[in-house]
From Swiss-Prot:
Chain segments annotated as coiled-coil in the UniProt record: none
Keyword annotations from UniProtKB, A to Z: Antenna complex, Lyase, Phycobilisome
Protein name: Bilin biosynthesis protein PecE
Protein origin, superkingdom: Bacteria
Pfam annotation, one family: HEAT_2
One GO cellular component term noted in the UniProt record for this chain: phycobilisome
Functional description taken from the UniProt entry: An enzyme involved in the biosynthesis of bilin.
Length: 269
């Protein structure tokens, strides 16, 4: 009988944290996922340790547990993890790990990540550019514009979209939005999906119209329209909490459109 069969099931934060220190790689991977899925803040320190655990390495050179620990830390959004995540950026053997770390830092949103991320962008070594540019957009590092503009002509269309997303958020110029919208009709299904997620991150009225017209499953449209709606409503709540609520006509119209579109899509599912 294998160790996985004999192991206790992970049903509590304590069991998941204990499993991270075990020997079974599959169980340790699942434990990291479980802690992130359930946003167990008590698991932050254990996940930071797992971020540097090199015991689980696949033949191609990647570190699955370390990647999953990074993703889980992003889900926790705990600023205490930032120093460990920044240190993990130094791993050069696994760009998949670096990508997961960059995404986690973007989710946490701590400004301490800005300098090391800009350093990666300026490096002459290959980087997970899509995640890196998206993180700089999320953190609103607008000073990186001169370094990011050339990526509009990168060989990867997904990297091009990330650069267009960054530049649209900075300038609101429609040509950058159009670069993303064009990919909604791409022959590659995954590029269409990536484009729709990029549009949802922008939350623009034209992005809503483009998503509704896109050649993607209704379930994917619904997911991303809900993301835009939640972003707009969260902004309203934030303004109310600060006593500054003043919703403009454009936002009101977009919210009404989103509610109607979501209702229509739910009926069609």
């Amino acid at each position: 009988m294998t160790a996985a069969c004999c192991a206790q099931p992970i049903l509590s934060p304590e069991a998941a944290i204990a499993a991270l220190a075990g020997e079974d790689n599959q169980i340790r991977y699942y434990a990291a996922w479980w802690l992130g899925k359930h946003q167990v803040q008590a698991g932050c320190a254990a996940l930071c340790e797992a971020l540097f655990d090199e015991r689980y390495r696949i033949p191609s050179g990647g570190y699955p547990l370390r990647r999953q620990a990074a993703r889980a830390l992003g889900q926790l959004k705990n600023p205490q993890a930032v120093p460990a995540l920044i240190a993990a950026l130094a791993c050069e053997e696994d760009l998949g790990l670096r990508e997961a770390v960059i995404q986690a830092l973007a989710m946490i949103g701590d400004r301490r990540a800005v300098h090391p991320l800009v350093q990666l962008l300026q490096s002459q070594q290959p980087q997970p550019y899509e995640a890196l540019i998206e993180a700089l957009a999320t953190l609103q590092v607008w000073s990186a514009r001169p370094q990011i503009e050339p990526f509009l002509y990168h060989s990867s269309e997904r990297v091009q979209c990330a650069a267009a997303r960054y530049l649209y958020l900075l300038t609101k110029q429609p040509q950058y939005l159009e670069r993303i919208v064009q990919n909604l009709n791409h022959d590659n299904m995954y590029l269409r999906w990536a484009a729709i997620f990029d549009l949802a991150a922008l939350g623009h009225r034209q992005a809503v119209d483009a998503i509704l017209a896109a050649k993607v499953p209704n379930s994917l449209k619904l997911l991303n329209l809900k993301r835009i709606l939640e972003t707009l409503l969260d902004g309203d709540r934030s303004q109310l909490n600060n006593g500054e609520f003043c919703q403009n006509q454009s936002d009101r119209e977009t919210i009404e459109l989103l509610f109607q579109a979501i209702d229509d899509l739910l009926i069609q599912l």
